[in-house]
């Protein structure tokens, strides 16, 4: 009854107006799963490869007709008739069919779309929500949201070199309360920026992109907004950064074009340590560049005992790179992006490896998103305890938050909001 009888691929648009892949998987009993694949702006060099057509006369070369063709053609030919409940077998069959180490032949966008749609179809066939189907009976932890309320770097056209400044409502008693907290801070910040004469346009992920000279200046605005919204920074709400340092790492130096400063790896580590001493920052993502292993080690040794150091470009949701990082003792957390690795099976393996090594895991969106809310279910399924899915504006971001509200309501008194326990540094 759960045999795959049809796979339909199509080209749709993401939140930046670029094409992406959507997949429908239909089972013998009529159940159907649909998944849309996200896309990143700041991509790690070691990520799985999304297949683009390269035809400059169509979507500027960003079309995905080849990936869609692979979905309905080669991939369906290989896994049609297989049992959708055999997720590992199906994902492994697609990996073998592609035959490359980075899924570049068929495209990680094609493979991931099918992988997630298979899981959703199987969940529907079993009459179970996706988080329960993937995570089992223990899936009941609602994640702390990392809400990106100030955008910089490649996500915005402003001088702020860091890509994201986020608020984390760790003191809330429920996810719904955490979401309200974030929304109130977001609207307060908008008023504060407007009052100071700054624009309140939003970036790719729904956060504000004010023309501020430095991360310090942006952090000061956020701290003020937290207080004026009626919350206590460092108690109710903690701060998090995504430096996306690979984007401004040039010739062994960290070049802050907005600040007109250049820092060595040691100076970069000390600068981040200084920020954590002056602001209630409990999580820093990609504080060092993806291949600056010495820098990562220095940063981890300096503040890894008290701050969550998240590897995004460093680990790219890849168990091989994560295992190497664990062995080296660099970072203490992994950012989990399903499209960085390209299958649900490999994503779950990365989370499992992280948890076994006492690393935290943060489920994450991409800057180019869709209305698909699968990662909300996966955050609960994996008991990650943290989710990073943008600001409190743009429906491509709020779709994930709204799905988490539904899950919390469905779980009722079984729901457990992760709160401070999500972060080793606060536990």
UniProtKB/Swiss-Prot annotation:
This is Enolase. The active site is at 205 (proton donor), 337 (proton acceptor). Binds a second Mg(2+) ion via substrate during catalysis. PROSITE patterns: ENOLASE. GO terms for biological process: glycolytic process. It comes from the Bacteria. (2R)-2-phosphoglycerate binds at residues 163, 337, 366-367, 388. SUPFAM superfamilies: Enolase C-terminal domain-like, Enolase N-terminal domain-like. It comes from Afipia carboxidovorans (strain ATCC 49405 / DSM 1227 / KCTC 32145 / OM5) (Oligotropha carboxidovorans). GO terms for cellular component: cell surface; extracellular region; phosphopyruvate hydratase complex. Belongs to the enolase family. The gene is eno. Its cofactor is Mg(2+). The keyword Zinc-finger does not apply. Catalyzes the reversible conversion of 2-phosphoglycerate (2-PG) into phosphoenolpyruvate (PEP). It is essential for the degradation of carbohydrates via glycolysis.
């Amino acid at each position: 009854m759960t045999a795959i009888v049809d796979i339909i691929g199509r080209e749709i648009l993401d939140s930046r107006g670029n094409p992406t892949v959507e997949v429908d998987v239909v089972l013998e009993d009529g159940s159907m799963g649909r998944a849309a694949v996200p896309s990143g702006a700041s991509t790690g060099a070691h990520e799985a490869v999304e297949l683009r057509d390269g035809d400059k006369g169509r979507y500027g070369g960003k079309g995905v007709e080849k990936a869609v063709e692979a979905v309905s053609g080669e991939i369906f030919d290989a896994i049609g008739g297989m049992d959708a409940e055999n997720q590992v077998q199906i994902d492994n069959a697609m990996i073998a069919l592609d035959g490359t180490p980075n899924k570049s032949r068929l495209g990680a966008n094609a493979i991931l779309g099918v992988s997630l749609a298979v899981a959703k179809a199987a969940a529907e066939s079993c009459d179970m929500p996706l988080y329960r189907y993937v995570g089992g009976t223990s899936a009941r932890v609602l994640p702390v949201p990392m809400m990106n309320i100030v955008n910089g770097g490649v996500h915005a056209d402003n001088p702020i070199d860091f890509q994201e400044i986020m608020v984390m409502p760790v003191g809330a008693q429920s996810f719904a309360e955490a979401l309200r907290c974030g929304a109130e801070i977001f609207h307060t910040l908008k008023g504060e920026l407007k009052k100071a004469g700054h624009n309140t346009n939003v970036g790719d992920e729904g956060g504000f992109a004010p023309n501020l000279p430095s991360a310090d200046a942006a952090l000061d605005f956020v701290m003020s907004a937290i207080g004026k919204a009626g919350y206590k920074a460092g108690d109710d709400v903690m701060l998090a950064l995504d430096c996306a340092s690979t984007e401004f790492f040039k010739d062994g130096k960290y070049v802050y074009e907005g600040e007109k400063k250049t820092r060595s790896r040691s100076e970069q580590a000390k600068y981040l340590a200084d920020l954590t001493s002056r602001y209630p920052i409990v999580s820093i993502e990609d504080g060092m560049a993806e291949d600056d292993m010495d820098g990562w080690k220095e940063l981890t040794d300096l503040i890894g005992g008290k701050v969550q150091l998240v590897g995004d470009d460093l680990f790219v949701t890849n168990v091989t790179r994560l295992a190497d990082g664990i062995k080296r003792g660099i970072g203490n957390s992994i950012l989990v992006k399903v499209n960085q690795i390209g299958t649900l099976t490999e994503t779950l393996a990365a989370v499992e490896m992280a948890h076994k090594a006492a690393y935290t895991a943060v489920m994450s969106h991409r800057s180019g998103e869709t209305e698909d809310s699968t990662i909300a279910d996966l955050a609960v399924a994996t008991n990650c305890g943290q989710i990073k899915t943008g600001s409190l504006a743009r429906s491509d971001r709020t779709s994930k938050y709204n799905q988490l509200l539904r899950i919390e309501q469905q779980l009722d008194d079984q729901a457990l909001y992760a709160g401070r326990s999500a972060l080793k540094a606060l536990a």
